[in-house]
Amino acid sequence: MEAFIIFLISSTSIPLLSNSAFELFNMIPRCSVSWTSLKKLSLRFCELSDECIAKILSGCPILESLTLSHCIYLTVLDLSKSLRLRTLEIACNIDNTRPRQIVAPHIHRLRLKTYQSPCALVDVSSLDEAQVDCFIYSHLKTLDAYLLQDILKMLEKLQNAEKLIFGCNILQILSLAEVCGLPFPMFKTKALTLETDIFQYVIPGIERLLQNSPDLKTVTVRPSDGNIMPGRCFDNYLDLQGLNPNQCWRSKDGVFWNKSRSNLGSKRVTLFVELMLKNTKILDKMVVQLNEHYLRSKLKEFVPTFSQKNNVLIVLSTTLRL
C-alpha cells in the first residue's frame, strides 16, 4: 500500500482514478498532480502547506468530496476554485492539525470536528447541511473565553443551513454562552440533530437553539459518542465571572437538572421532552434516543402523557453506548 501511494504521489497523471475514492495516508505530497477524473479524495495524517493543497486541488477539477483528517501545517483552506466540490469533512484532535480558515463557497455539506477552537468559516454561503463539534482535553480546569466567541462566530456562518447537527461539547459551550448573556444568531434550519445525553450543562444551549429556529420541523436527540468536556470547566468559568453555577444551569422554567449524565429517570426524560415542545413552534416530529447505559428505568416506564402540541409525533427509543 505504501509503495502504491508513493507511486501515485510522484505521478503527474493517473488516468485510472475514475469514479472510485482515493486516500493518501501519512504522506508529504510535494508535486503537482493531474487527477482529472477523481471525485472523492481523503488525506489523512499528511503534511500539507497551503501551496501544496492548492496544487492538489488544481489537479482535481471535478472533485466532489474532500476529507482532511489530522493534516498538519495547513493554514488557509481555499476551495473557491473547486467549483464542483460539495462535501467537506475535517477532523483533528491536536491544535496544528486543522486549517485556521476555510473558504468554501460551493460546498453543500460540512462535517467539522476540531480541537478546541473551530476553524474560521470565511465563506460557506452555499451550505445546506453542517455537522460540528469540538474536542477538548478533559484535564483542563476551565474554558478559555475566546472559545465562546469563536463558536458563536461559527454559528453565524451556519444560519442558512437547513440541516444542522451539533455535538455535545458544542452544546455545552453554547449553554455557557447563553447563561453568560451572549447573543445567539437566528437559524433557518428545518432539521436539527443534537448528539448529547440529557444533563444540566446542555439545557440552556438547547433551549436557545430551539427558540432561535422558528422553521424547525424535526428535532432528533441521540447519545453522544464520548469525549465529553467535564462540567468543572464550565462551573469554574462561571465562578471566575462571579456567577453561581448552581443557579445558572437551571432551565428558564426554574427546573434544576441532573448534573451527571447517569441515573436518568423517567421524570427527567418527560421534562426534557416538554422543554423541547415548549420551545418550538411548528414542530412535526421529535425523536429522542436514550443511552440505555445511563437509564435507571426501563423504556416501558417512559410513557408519560406528554402535552400534545400541534400533533407532534414523539418517538422514544434506547441504544447501548458506553
Swiss-Prot record:
Listed name of the protein: Probable F-box protein At1g60180
Location of the F-box domain: 45-88
PANTHER family the UniProt entry points to: OJ000223_09.16 PROTEIN
Coiled-coil residue spans: none
SUPFAM superfamilies, per database record: RNI-like
Gene3D superfamilies xref list: Ribonuclease Inhibitor
Domain of life: Eukaryota
